[in-house]
Structures are given as structure tokens and as C-alpha cells.
């Protein structure tokens, strides 16, 4: 449950609650001509995939398959950036609803600093031997909404 995170909760969590309360999701307009509204891109990764990677790394360490050359920081994502629009639309779809998205101005204090594109380079992780696929955005949203948000599971 992400309720305790307030503003720092995931986009899906906020979208789900906006849909429940208002029937729509608000996303930032783009303030750059090379990105359409809602098409700002992030490399969204499902937390279950992160847990799988960490579990695999620990298994490799205990099995003595981990070498010092593999030590270091890893940038984890899926290696495929997706839009905030896709994330919001799939939050509706996971509930059997038609997407209803409104675009609002980005606050001035973040407008000039906002990152329009982030995507993890997965080469380092793949070079360690991790070859499992990651959940698609659609799969991750569907699972999270259906199994955690709709039943309002709290932990």
C-alpha cells in the first residue's frame, strides 16, 4: 500500500485515486514542441520485476556465481521508455473503463527542469547473465490495479 507516501506515491496510485474521485486523470501538458501532451517518456518498471532482479543477484552471490567484476550500481528499468499517457490509459483499461485524460499546465517551478525522456540502459545487467523478460507496462498496471488497488489491500 502506498497511501503513506502522499505526493511520492506512484503515478498509478495517484491515477487510480483520481479516477475513483473524479472519473478522470490529469497529466501535464508538454511545454516542448517535440513532445505531445502526455507523451513525456519514462522507463516504468514494475516493482515485482525489481524484486526478481535483486533475488536473482542474491542467488548468484550465494551460489558463488557472482564475481567482483559484477559489483557496482545498476540502473534498473525495462530498457523501453513509455508515455505517461500510456500509463494513465492503462489504469483506466485495467478497471474496464474508457480513458478520460485531461492535460494541465506544468507548474512553472519545474517546467525548465522537467525531464521529458528517461530510459535505463540495461547492458550492464544483461552482461551479468540476467536474461528474464520484464513485465510490459500493460501487465504491470493490470496486476497492480486488479490485485492491490481494487481490493484496497493494506500492508
Residue map of PLM features:
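Flexible, glycine-rich beta-alpha linker
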Residues: 1-11, 35
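C-terminal substrate-binding subdomain of Rossmann-fold SDR/epimerase-dehydratase oxidoreductases
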Residues: 19-155
Amino acid at each position: 500500500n502506498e497511501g503513506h507516501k502522499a505526493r511520492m506515491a506512484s503515478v498509478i496510485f495517484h491515477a487510480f485515486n483520481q479516477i475513483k474521485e473524479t472519473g478522470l486523470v490529469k497529466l501535464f501538458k508538454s511545454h516542448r514542441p517535440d513532445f505531445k501532451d502526455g507523451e513525456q517518456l519514462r522507463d516504468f518498471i514494475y516493482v515485482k520485476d525489481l524484486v526478481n532482479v535483486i533475488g536473482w543477484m542474491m542467488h548468484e552471490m550465494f551460489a558463488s556465481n557472482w564475481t567482483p567484476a559484477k559489483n557496482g550500481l545498476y540502473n534498473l528499468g525495462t530498457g523501453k521508455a513509455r508515455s505517461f499517457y500510456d500509463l494513465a490509459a492503462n489504469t483506466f483499461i485495467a478497471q474496464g473503463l474508457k480513458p478520460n485524460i485531461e492535460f494541465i499546465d506544468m507548474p512553472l517551478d519545474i517546467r525548465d527542469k522537467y525531464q521529458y525522456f528517461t530510459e535505463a540502459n540495461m547492458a550492464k545487467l544483461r552482461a551479468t547473465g540476467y536474461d528474464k523478460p520484464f513485465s510490459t507496462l500493460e501487465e504491470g498496471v493490470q496486476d497492480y490495479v486488479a490485485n492491490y488497488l481494487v481490493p484496497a489491500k493494506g500492508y
